[in-house]
């Protein structure tokens, strides 16, 4: 679409066979998680903007590069908070958003001690992976060592979170949103479907629209997203939204990734 709109498009990542590259004017084999390499590439090519799409780990890189080059962006520190699950959970808790009880750790011995503060079942997640990789639902402490090792194997920062499982009321909420100059201007929320038997790598099976839930839930979600956008001083940005209405009646924002797709 960017090409159709007349933009000169340059793509980069470490997988040359990814399908999007064939539509770009130029492709460079540079990992989107290597901030300095992407910065040097963008500076050399004198780009006018950097956009992260479909993958949370690329979002901080885009913000970092734009900030260093003086290009339009939301603050790098804010994007980093949105992109790392432990930082995001801490931010939510400190700013009075609903958040499941959680602990952060970086090793099995630490997790074994910390999990005593939680009620099973719990979710174990890498703080910085994408595509639901390394996510497991733990129902028995005997599973802990394997699940910790799995989560750590997908974390570049070698950090994980363990959080109490939220019993959903209805479907999980998923979709995209856009802010313009810090104001939420658009969203499309859908019902997200998961296999009832899934216990690992919680990738959705699909989504459907229109969203089937009470209008007041949408209103509450809009208010929470706008508050996050305002407090984090986000600018003109796309977001990937994941939320859950718990059976306890509380609405939880699980993800507000600073990227679309």
Residue ranges with predicted function:
Residues 50-53, 102-105, 165:
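Structural motif
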Residues 67-134:
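A conserved helix-loop-beta module that forms one wall/lid of the active-site cleft
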Residues 98-100, 121-124, 136-169, 200-207, ...:
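Conserved ATP-binding module of the ATP-grasp superfamily
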Residues 37, 110-114, 143:
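Short acidic active-site motifs
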Residues 167-172, 176-234, 238, 245, ...:
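ATP-dependent carboxylate/phosphate-activation module, predominantly the ATP-grasp catalytic core
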Residues 1-78, 109:
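ATP-binding N-terminal substructure of ATP-dependent carboxylate-amine bond-forming enzymes
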């Amino acid at each position: 679409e960017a090409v159709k709109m007349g933009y000169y498009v340059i793509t980069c990542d470490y997988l040359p066979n990814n399908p999007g590259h064939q539509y770009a004017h130029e492709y460079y084999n540079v990992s989107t998680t290597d901030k300095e390499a992407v910065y040097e590439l963008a500076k050399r090519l004198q780009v006018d903007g950097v956009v992260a799409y479909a993958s949370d780990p690329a979002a901080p890189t885009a913000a970092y590069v734009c900030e260093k080059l003086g290009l339009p962006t939301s603050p790098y520190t804010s994007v980093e908070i949105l992109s790392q699950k432990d930082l995001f959970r801490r931010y939510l808790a400190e700013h009075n958003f609903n958040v499941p009880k959680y602990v952060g750790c970086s090793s099995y011995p630490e997790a074994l001690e910390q999990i005593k503060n939680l009620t099973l079942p719990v979710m174990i997640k890498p703080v910085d992976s994408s595509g639901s990789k390394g996510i497991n639902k733990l129902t028995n402490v005997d599973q802990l060592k394997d699940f910790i090792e799995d989560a750590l194997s997908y974390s570049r920062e070698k950090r994980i979170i363990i959080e109490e499982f939220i019993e959903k009321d209805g479907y999980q909420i998923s979709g995209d949103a856009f802010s313009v100059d810090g104001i939420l201007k658009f969203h499309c929320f859908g019902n997200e479907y998961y296999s009832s038997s899934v216990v690992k790598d919680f990738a959705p099976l699909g989504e459907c629209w229109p969203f089937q839930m009470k209008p007041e839930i949408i209103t509450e979600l809009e208010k929470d997203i706008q508050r996050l956008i305002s407090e984090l001083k986000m600018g003109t940005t796309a977001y990937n939204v994941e939320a859950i209405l718990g059976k306890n009646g509380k609405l939880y924002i699980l993800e507000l990734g600073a990227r679309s797709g």
